Amino acid sequence: MEVCRCHHGYLISLLLFLFHSETACYPLGKRPCEMQAFRIWDVNQKTFYLRNNQLVAGYLQGPNTKLEEKIDVVPIEPHAMFLGIHGGKLCLACVKSGDEIKLGLEPVNITDLNSSKEEDKRFAFIRSDSGPTTSFESAACPGWFLCTALETDQPVGLTNTPQDAVQVTKFYFQQDQ
């Protein structure tokens, strides 16, 4: 019986091709992954919704549950992604204004963003999973994390003190069915 003598690189490539993860898509030239919708809520069970063109986190009940915003995701690297809402037409961005850094919503089509363009880096977030929860760090502003306030119906923002007890940086992040 003759043993196949192929390079390990080919075997590894074949295995990666056969057993890839949808949430860890990797671009090969043009981005092969399509936009996916996710539900997001913080560890205090506050969901995201839009109020006066601002993304806020609060407790939605009864008929208000339909106001929940799904997060549109386009993976750009194994743990980096563009985040948007409204079918990917409004994108979350790390906005620098002087010494201030804040979360913004910009009217940009998420599928038009390009991870190799420096000006699009502000829309990229790095996903870190820790058990059942996920945190999102800005790629453009390292050390700044997506956060919610402890109080309900407050704007979703960014913080550079993720261990601070007045900000929530841990989220449940689940693909929408």
Curated annotation (Swiss-Prot):
SUPFAM superfamilies, alphabetized: Cytokine
Disulfide links within the chain: C91-C141
Major subcellular site: secreted
Molecular function per GO: cytokine activity; interleukin-1 receptor antagonist activity; interleukin-1 receptor binding
Carbohydrate attachment residues: N109, N114
Subcellular location field: Secreted
GO CC annotation terms, alphabetical: extracellular space
Extent of the signal sequence: 1-25
Gene Ontology biological process terms, A to Z: inflammatory response to antigenic stimulus; negative regulation of interleukin-1-mediated signaling pathway
Keyword field: Disulfide bond, Glycoprotein, Secreted, Signal
Its job: Anti-inflammatory antagonist of interleukin-1 family of proinflammatory cytokines such as interleukin-1beta/IL1B and interleukin-1alpha/IL1A. Protects from immune dysregulation and uncontrolled systemic inflammation triggered by IL1 for a range of innate stimulatory agents such as pathogens.
Family assignment from sequence similarity: Belongs to the IL-1 family.
Protein name according to UniProt: Interleukin-1 receptor antagonist protein
Organism the protein comes from: Tursiops truncatus
Lineage, highest ranks first: Eukaryota, Metazoa, Chordata, Craniata, Vertebrata
